[in-house]
Amino acid sequence: MKDNPISLFHELESYVRGSKDTLHRYMYACILEQRLADLLLLSRCGVHPDDEDRLAVRLASQRSLCVQAASDLAEGTEEARGSTPAWPDCKVTKSSAAQKRPELLSLVKVMQELRTPECSGYDLCDLEVCREDALHWLRDHADPSSPPVLIGVRTGGAFYAPLWSSALQQRWGNKALYHTVRALRMPSDPGASLYLPEELSILPAAIEPDTDIVILEDQPHTGGTVLELAGRLSAKYRLNKPVWVSSPGRLFQIENGRLAKCSDRIPLNTGTRKRIWQMLGNSEEVAEFLLPKLGLTDAHPADLEAVPYKSVPQWNDPMYRREVPFRINPKKTPFYIRRKSTNEPVVFAKFIGKDLFGDFQFHQLKKFEKYFPDILAYQDGYVMTKYEPGLKEMREMFVNMPSAVTREICQSVSGYWKTLLDSCQISGGHPVHPLADHWQARLGEMEDFIGRKLPYDLDWFERSLHTEWTSSAHVYTSLPYANQYGHWKARLSAGQRLKTYRFHIDSTWGGTSSIEVELASFLLENRVRPDDFRLLVNQVKKEAGSLTIEAVTDALPIACVLQAANLLKQAKDESRLSKELILSEAMQSFEYLQAMKPKLSDVR
C-alpha cells in the first residue's frame, strides 16, 4: 500500500502544515497516531516490514504530542506550536495481507480511507468537552488512587482519549497515559467486532486490582464494539469492578453485560457562538445570520427564509437528547435560502463536515470549482452555492442531443477525473471489488423487491466482479454514495455554450474506488453511447496511464450492482423511493447494459 506522492494523505499533511489552527493540528496528530498504531499492528502480525521497536517508540512519542496538543486545545491556545510530522508510508497490499492474515483485510481497507469521525460528521460535538468529561468522572463518579487505564477505540476514540489523558495528568502527571486499539470486522461475520491478540498484548501486562478502565468510543449503538472489548479486558486483567465507557458528553458503566448510562449532557461548548446546525428549524435566524456572508446585495432579511431540502427531524435538535439514538446530524439537513416574495431559491447549503475534516474537504472541493455552481460561502461546515435553476440531467442530453454536443460533454467532464486523480488518489486499492462476495445476493434482493428477473449475463458479471484491480489508479471518492445520474447535470445556453456540473463531489462519507469503476458508473448512469464511451475513456487515459477501454468495459457490471445496492438503500431510508421508480431504473440499467454489450466489442 505504498502511498503515491500526490496521495490524499500527503494532500492532508500539506494542508495542515499551512494551518496554525490548534484544532487542525490536534486532529491531524490523532490521525497520525492511528496510522502509527495500525502500522505497528501490521508489523506485529508479520505483514509489514518496518521494525516493531522503532514503530513502538515513534507511537509513544506521537501519543505524547497528542496529549500536548489536547492541552493546547483545551486551554484555548490561539496558535498551534511545533512542526507537523510527516505522513508515514505503508508498503502492504490487500492481496499480501489476505494471503497471510485474512482478518487484516478490513484493517488495510480502513488505512486507505480518511474516515470522518462521528464528532465531525454526524454526531457533532465540541471536542474540548471530552476533557470536561474526564474531570466530571473524577469529581462525581470515581475517586481513584491511581490513574485509570484509558483505551480509545480507533477511529473515534482516538480523538477523545488524549483529552482525557490531558485532564488526568493534572493529578497524576505523565503516569496518565492512554492507549488505542482497532476494532476490526470478522471475515465470517462482518457485524461482529474483532480485537487481535497482537494488539491487546501491547496493553499493560497487569494492573492493580482496584485500577479503573475507561474505554473511549463514539456514541454506542448496540454497544457491541465496547462490550466485546470490555469482555476481553475483564478476562485479561481478572477485573472485579465494572468497566467505564465514555463518548462525548456521556458516561456509562458496563453492568451484567449491558451499558448502563450514568450521566448525559449536550456535548457542546456553551461559550461558543451558535452554529448554523444549531439554528435549524428557525428559518429567520438562519437567513439573518447568513445574509451578510452571501453577497446578496439586493436581498432583505425579511424577504429570505431557510427551507429544508428534506424535513428536519426533531432528533437533530440538541434539546431532544432523550431520544435514542440521538445525534446532532447536519448530514441530513441540506437547505435552500429562498425569497419569500417569489418563492425563488437563491442559495443551496450542504453540510460537508466540521473541524479539520470539513475544512480540508472544502479545501479539496475548491479544486473542482469548474464543476460547481458559484461558491458563495463556507460556514460551520456548510458549503453555500448559488442556486442554479433550469439545469438538465446529463443523461437526458446523452440520449437526446446530437453527437457534437455529447462529444463536448465528454471533453468537459473528463477534467473531473483528472482533478480526482491529482487530489484524491490513494494507493494499494482493492484486488477484487468489495461487492464481489455478495453480488448475487444483492441482485436477488433487488429481484425480490421489484418482483421481476433482471436480465444479465451471469458469466460476464461473475468475471467482472472478481476482476483484480491491482494495477489500477484508486481514488477516495463520493462514488459509493453519490453515483446516481441526478448528480450529473448540464446547461446549454442560447449561444450553445455548455456548462457541466457534478454535484456531491465531497467525499466526507465516501470510500475507495478504482478509476475504472468511477468511469463505468458514469457511463451506465448517463446511458452514454459507444462512440462517446471511447472518447471519454481515451481522454481520461491521458491522466491514468494504465487505464484501458477493456478495463472500463469489464467494470460495467460492478457499476450495475453498485447502482442496485444504492437503489435498495434508498428504498429503505428516509427518501423511500417508490417500488415503481426503482423497478423502472433497475430494468432500464440492465437492459442498457445488455444492449451495449455486443456494441462494446467495437469500442475495444
Curated annotation (Swiss-Prot):
The keyword Glycosyltransferase applies. One of its GO terms (molecular function) is pentosyltransferase activity. GO terms for biological process: antibiotic biosynthetic process. Divalent metal ion. It catalyses: neamine + 5-phospho-alpha-D-ribose 1-diphosphate = 5''-phosphoribostamycin + diphosphate. Its cofactor is a divalent metal cation. Keywords: Antibiotic biosynthesis, Glycosyltransferase, Transferase. It comes from the Bacteria. Catalyzes phosphoribosylation of neamine using 5-phosphoribosyl-1-diphosphate (PRPP) as a phosphoribosyl donor to generate 5''-phosphoribostamycin in the biosynthetic pathway of butirosin. This is Neamine phosphoribosyltransferase.
